[in-house]
Regions:
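Signature of small four-pass
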Residues: 2-34, 76-133, 145-172
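A surface-exposed beta-alpha-beta supersecondary segment
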Residues: 24-80, 97-98
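Short, highly charged, low-complexity non-transmembrane loops/tails of multi-pass membrane proteins
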Residues: 174-176
Length: 176
């Protein structure tokens, strides 16, 4: 089968990229980048939101609305953009490493690894920008924010392991 000729580190990169893709996708999509609790007329209200949706929850009901692009600060658009790019790069990297299993082209593997690192830095930019710009608010960072940090770490680790693997095993093959 196609996996037999690949190195163990290549399989580690593949597994890291799968987890990176799914953590990035979930962090990108769910409305849990922040959570805030406040008391309104004796009723405890919990609000939470992400890049695309905002929700309010009380004992009586929960309502969610999609964010409308009007009136957002430029930094929030930048966070959305870098999160979107991160997700696209992690998907592209995963597709290329799967194609590498079938076509065994070292440059395809190297491109996958490079896209993983680029996606990781897009993820880093998005969560750092969000953290810096919303640090004065009475919000607590929540699970999707943590998933974005996890996706950054997984993507960067996959990139570093992949570059090491490429230099150890595939670099000689490309020179001959």
């Amino acid at each position: 089968m196609c996996f037999e000729r690949n190195t163990p580190l290549c399989m580690v990169v593949f597994i890291l990229l799968v987890f990176c893709f799914f953590t990035d996708l979930i962090g990108f999509a769910i409305p849990y980048w922040y959570k805030a609790d406040y008391n309104a007329s004796g009723i405890m209200i919990i609000s939470y939101g992400g890049l695309w949706e905002f929700c309010k929850e009380s004992i009586h009901n929960t309502s969610c609305v999609n964010w409308v692009d009007d009136g957002f600060a430029g930094w929030f658009h930048a966070v959305r953009t870098f999160s979107t790019l991160s997700w696209i790069f992690s998907l592209s990297s995963l597709i290329l490493v799967v194609l590498f299993f079938f076509y065994d082209r070292a440059m395809m593997y190297l491109a996958s690894v490079c896209l993983s690192v680029i996606g990781a830095f897009c993820s880093l930019t998005s969560f750092l920008l969000y953290a810096v710009e919303s640090s004065g608010d009475q919000k607590k960072f929540y699970s999707a924010f943590t998933l974005t940090i996890t996706a950054f770490l997984l993507g960067l680790t996959a990139g570093v392991v992949g570059i090491i693997d490429f230099l150890l095993h595939f670099g000689d093959r490309e020179r001959h």
